[in-house]
Amino acid sequence: MSSGRIVQIIGAVIDVEFPRDAVPSVYNALKVQGAETTLEVQQQLGDGVVRTIAMGSTEGLKRGLDVVDTKAAISVPVGKATLGRIMDVLGNPIDEAGPIGEEERRGIHRKAPSFAEQAGGNDLLETGIKVIDLVCPFAKGGKVGLFGGAGVGKTVNMMELIRNIAIEHSGYSVFAGVGERTREGNDFYHEMKDSNVLDKVALVYGQMNEPPGNRLRVALTGLTMAEKFRDEGNDVLLFVDNIYRYTLAGTEVSALLGRMPSAVGYQPTLAEEMGVLQERITSTKEGSITSIQAVYVPADDLTDPSPATTFAHLDATVVLSRDIASLGIYPAVDPLDSTSRQLDPNVIGNEHYETARQVQYVLQRYKELKDIIAILGMDELSETDKQLVARARKIQRFLSQPFFVAEVFTGSPGKYVSLKDTIAGFSGILKGDYDHLPEQAFYMVGSIDEAIEKAKKL
């Protein structure tokens, strides 16, 4: 093993000098002697000097310390030994439950499957959440993004999807916590434990308080574990919360690596870094990876380079809106902004497609009429428009739903609504079958039968 020494430390970025004939390759892992720190080579600067990112705190490191080249990329445990465990970016256990005891380790930098190896499918993945199943259905083996600003419910929606899909879906799941709150990681662990699905989930955390190196690589660590399950012929779920923090970690180290910033101060390699991660999240002929990613939207601006770059890679986008959340309608999914490639009559069938499009039409028309109502009042509308507004308000309330993971806060039991019941409920409202019911009856219920029951009590 060749060894070098530290010549410069700037925050999380460390320059190491090696003999000219033994310069480590890019992405090689280096170990600092006498410290537990791992470094990853990012650039070769010439004259035997390499620029690296530290996977951990750089406190206590100083110039002149010896560094050893491991001659390989960072590798992490993969396989069934990882299930039910919490690990960090390097695959070390952080749940105080002893060593992982893995049979195999894999490098976190791998090539994406070739075009010939990839496989696509049109099978729908039922989530039990009405608004998602209706207007932006998920594909099995697809990629889904949950977009939203701060505090509109990305993590709660993510937890509900995990609960509904991971419990109904008997396969394996991998959860990568990228730069999110440690408290949420803890809540998630206990949620999985209480639901008795912990033995099917591998958890990888690189939280907010960790150095940028950890947050930049933790998504790749989780993905490497998911790829192993996929290559063994399983259908895997990969949850990433939050993909924006992955971009942000790249931004933090980009300037230290000596790159010029691009738009809004992001790294110039933003699209490439996103592509490297997203292209690996794909289904092959062996098995599938269905990925659900939360995407933080800075200042609620969907045109910000980070969410805008993420859009290009997704099959379905679920947009959470602050305006809808302010009406008290949860999940605060915007049915007019959310889209899915699966929303096609050839994939989901005519009835589902027509119902979804009609719901969107009614809500869009209501949005247009709001200005007239605000100025002139309801009385100035034609009879047809009055009827449309009444139905739109019922649809808007019927799009809300009590969640299982929020039972503790709301006090009302969670509801799982099958796709069949969802379509039946909305098409009934559109046809006018429930025009006689008060709109409050549709708020925070599961299926349409519950709305009818609720109306009797009002």
Curated annotation (Swiss-Prot):
A GO CC term attached to the entry: plasma membrane
Coiled coil ranges: none
Enzyme class: translocase
Family annotation (Pfam families): ATP-synt_ab (PF00006), ATP-synt_ab_N (PF02874), ATP-synt_VA_C (PF22919)
Main location group: membrane
Binding residues for ATP: G148, G149, A150, G151, V152, G153, K154, T155
Keywords recorded for this protein, A-Z: ATP synthesis, ATP-binding, Cell inner membrane, Cell membrane, CF(1), Hydrogen ion transport, Ion transport, Membrane, Nucleotide-binding, Translocase, Transport
Annotated catalysed reactions: ATP + H2O + 4 H(+)(in) = ADP + phosphate + 5 H(+)(out)
Intracellular or extracellular location(s): Cell inner membrane
Cited PROSITE patterns: ATPASE_ALPHA_BETA
Entry superkingdom: Bacteria
Membrane topology: Peripheral membrane protein
Gene3D superfamilies for this protein: 2.40.10.170, Bovine Mitochondrial F1-atpase, Atp Synthase Beta Chain, Chain D, domain 3, P-loop containing nucleotide triphosphate hydrolases
EC number: 7.1.2.2
InterPro entries: AAA+_ATPase, ATP-synt_VA_C, ATP_synth_F1_bsu, ATPase_a/bsu_AS, ATPase_alpha/beta_chains, ATPase_F1/V1/A1_a/bsu_N, ATPase_F1/V1/A1_a/bsu_N_sf, ATPase_F1/V1/A1_a/bsu_nucl-bd
GO MF term (any one): ATP hydrolysis activity
Family: Belongs to the ATPase alpha/beta chains family.
Protein task: Produces ATP from ADP in the presence of a proton gradient across the membrane. The catalytic sites are hosted primarily by the beta subunits.
Assembly behavior: F-type ATPases have 2 components, CF(1) - the catalytic core - and CF(0) - the membrane proton channel. CF(1) has five subunits: alpha(3), beta(3), gamma(1), delta(1), epsilon(1). CF(0) has three main subunits: a(1), b(2) and c(9-12). The alpha and beta chains form an alternating ring which encloses part of the gamma chain. CF(1) is attached to CF(0) by a central stalk formed by the gamma and epsilon chains, while a peripheral stalk is formed by the delta and b chains.
Protein name, entry field: ATP synthase subunit beta
